[in-house]
């Protein structure tokens, strides 16, 4: 009886160590990726491809190949070209690789490789940030994420890959390379602009103000270089189409705000309220979570920065990853409208953010599962859209609240030490 009890305790200890000890991620990650590769093959083999934008992409590329450089005249069956120039160049390559877009099967294989590459980089970031192995499992179980990459062939998959590569580079202090890859991602789809506030903080904390400004100019220069063929022809048309910020979203496609009703969704007041919330949350994160490595409050930090007396901080990999993913989550929470393909950016970020929020592993899985259900509900419902917003709120306010809790504990321990 006692031996059985000891064996049970040993088993529990071993299972806990397997789930919680970060050293196990070095072998767990390759096994999960290998298993997911098999799953990808099964999906391509068994699940029918769904045509949404691929044909339109190919029609637009056909016009580009024929010599059209006026962005306002490049269109397809489902609408005009509304993505920056790097999207055109990448799908131009895919156009030629897939027999002008006709070889869908090859396209799916290429996107499966892209998916596995994205997953590999994301898991590498998790491992370097010291995340426990149990967080890796949800990364390979997302039905919607597999769909975005392999069954839809959306450009969001390519942009998500660029996002994770840039996060990896910033974590490893390859700041210039990180800026180049991130800006290239923005030139595929400007959703990656949501990471800009955190990237600015990482650069300023790591390099101070002057060098950060230079890297900011580098990011802008990359956008100009990508856009040159179109800027020469119709600069206003290119900028207005590729970086349109005033687009009117359709209520029937929204994943996140269906529960507020169409009248409120379409109102200018709602749009301004979301913008105000976005700015407020960014301000809170700058003043608390993202400023933590500087060891000072916001006024003194700004004063030292202006007076050029700021000493650069050494940023942990976990901090960099948290900053960039929380900036993404804030942007998605306050987004005017989310569509299903946006899950390409969020899917691999959620487990890490919930862990950084200090949630119990069971709660991490509950919130993750609820979010996965909500993003798989088609069409979206009042209930599913509410869960989308609440799960994002859990990530954003969880990270913010955990940061406040840590600061309070640190202050309390310092007082006890002084006494």
Curated annotation (Swiss-Prot):
GO cellular component, one term: endoplasmic reticulum
Membrane topology term: Multi-pass membrane protein
Keyword Endoplasmic reticulum in record: yes
Reactions catalysed according to its record: an alpha-D-Man-(1->2)-alpha-D-Man-(1->2)-alpha-D-Man-(1->3)-[alpha-D-Man-(1->6)]-beta-D-Man-(1->4)-beta-D-GlcNAc-(1->4)-alpha-D-GlcNAc-diphospho-di-trans,poly-cis-dolichol + a di-trans,poly-cis-dolichyl beta-D-mannosyl phosphate = an alpha-D-Man-(1->2)-alpha-D-Man-(1->2)-alpha-D-Man-(1->3)-[alpha-D-Man-(1->3)-alpha-D-Man-(1->6)]-beta-D-Man-(1->4)-beta-D-GlcNAc-(1->4)-alpha-D-GlcNAc-diphospho-di-trans,poly-cis-dolichol + a di-trans,poly-cis-dolichyl phosphate + H(+)
UniProt topological domain (Lumenal) ranges: 1-24, 99-103, 171-178, 232-269, 336-348, 405-419
Keyword Transmembrane tagged: yes
Molecular function via GO: dol-P-Man:Man(5)GlcNAc(2)-PP-Dol alpha-1,3-mannosyltransferase activity
Subcellular localization: Endoplasmic reticulum membrane
Annotated EC: 2.4.1.258
Top EC class for this record: transferase
InterPro entries for the chain: Glycosyltransferase_ALG3
Membrane topology, Cytoplasmic segments: 46-77, 125-147, 208-212, 291-314, 370-383
Gene Ontology biological process: dolichol-linked oligosaccharide biosynthetic process; protein glycosylation
Biochemical pathway: Protein modification; protein glycosylation
Stored PANTHER family: DOL-P-MAN:MAN(5)GLCNAC(2)-PP-DOL ALPHA-1,3-MANNOSYLTRANSFERASE (PTHR12646:SF0), NOT56 - RELATED (PTHR12646)
Family statement drawn from the similarity comment of this UniProt entry: Belongs to the glycosyltransferase ALG3 family.
Protein name (Swiss-Prot/TrEMBL): Dol-P-Man:Man(5)GlcNAc(2)-PP-Dol alpha-1,3-mannosyltransferase
Species the sequence originates in: Aspergillus fumigatus (strain ATCC MYA-4609 / CBS 101355 / FGSC A1100 / Af293) (Neosartorya fumigata)
Chain's gene name: alg3
